A protein has these predicted regions:
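OB-fold ssDNA-binding interfaces and closely related basic DNA-contact patches used
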Residues: 1-115, 156-186
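Beta-strand-rich binding-surface signature
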Residues: 79-81, 122, 135
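Glycine-rich loops and low-complexity Gly/Arg-rich segments
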Residues: 119-121, 149-151, 162-165
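OB-fold/S1-family single-stranded nucleic acid-binding modules
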Residues: 128-156
Length: 186
C-alpha cells in the first residue's frame, strides 16, 4: 500500500483560480492525484495562520510529529498537500486538502480494494455553499490510464513539496531533482 505507507496519525484534538495551487471552485472540480506520500511528492502536516513580521496573514506549516513553530489564535488544521493534474486549468498544481471529511474520503478510497491507489483514477469534488455553509462531496471516476501528455508534464515538473514546511515555493528553481522510478503508478 505504497500510497499510505508514510502517513502518520494525527491526534484528534489537533486542530483555483489557476496558478500553482488548485482552489476548489463552486460546483464540480475534476483532478488526478499525481504524487505519492512515499516519494515526497505529496506531504501531510499541520497548518496554522498568523501574522508575519510585516503584519500580513501568512500560513505556517510543519510536520505532524513536530512542535508547532509558534502559538496560533485558531487551532491548526491537518493538511495533505497533493500534487495534482487540474483538468479545468490543464495544469499541474498543488491542492492543499484541509477539510477533514475530504481527507477521510480519500483515505477510505485508497484503502478500498475496489478503488485502491487514487493515482489510477480521477477524483471529482463538488463544492456547494459559502463560508460556514460550505459542503463538499468527493466522487471517484472509473479507473483509466492517464493521458501520455499529463505523464510527460508530471515527469518534467520539478517540485520540492518540503519547501512548504519552510514557507518557500515548492516550484522554485532550487527545487530538488526528483529521482526517476521504474514504477508507473498511473
Amino acid at each position: 500500500m505504497a500510497f499510505l505507507d508514510n502517513l502518520k496519525e494525527v491526534p484528534q484534538n489537533s486542530g483555483s483560480g489557476g496558478g500553482k495551487y488548485m482552489k476548489l471552485q463552486q460546483g464540480s472540480n475534476l483532478f488526478r492525484i499525481l504524487g505519492s506520500f512515499e516519494d515526497g511528492t505529496n506531504i501531510q502536516g499541520m497548518l496554522g495562520w498568523a501574522e508575519d513580521e510585516e503584519g500580513n496573514r501568512k500560513p505556517f506549516r510543519w510536520e505532524v510529529d513536530q512542535e508547532a513553530p509558534r502559538k496560533f489564535k485558531e487551532n491548526p488544521r491537518q493538511f495533505y498537500a497533493l500534487l495534482v493534474w487540474n483538468y479545468a486549468d490543464e495544469a499541474i498544481q498543488i491542492y492543499e486538502m484541509t477539510q477533514a471529511k475530504l481527507r477521510q474520503d480519500l483515505l477510505t478510497l485508497a484503502k478500498d480494494e475496489d478503488w485502491g491507489d487514487p493515482r489510477k483514477y480521477d477524483l471529482k469534488i463538488v463544492r456547494n455553499g459559502e463560508g460556514l455553509e460550505t459542503s463538499y462531496a468527493m466522487t471517484p471516476s472509473p479507473h483509466k490510464k492517464l493521458a501520455a501528455e499529463i505523464i510527460e508534464a508530471f515527469k518534467d515538473t520539478k517540485v520540492d513539496m518540503s519547501a512548504l514546511y519552510r514557507g518557500e515555493d515548492p516550484f522554485a528553481e532550487s527545487a530538488q531533482e526528483e529521482e526517476a522510478t521504474e514504477e508507473d503508478p498511473f
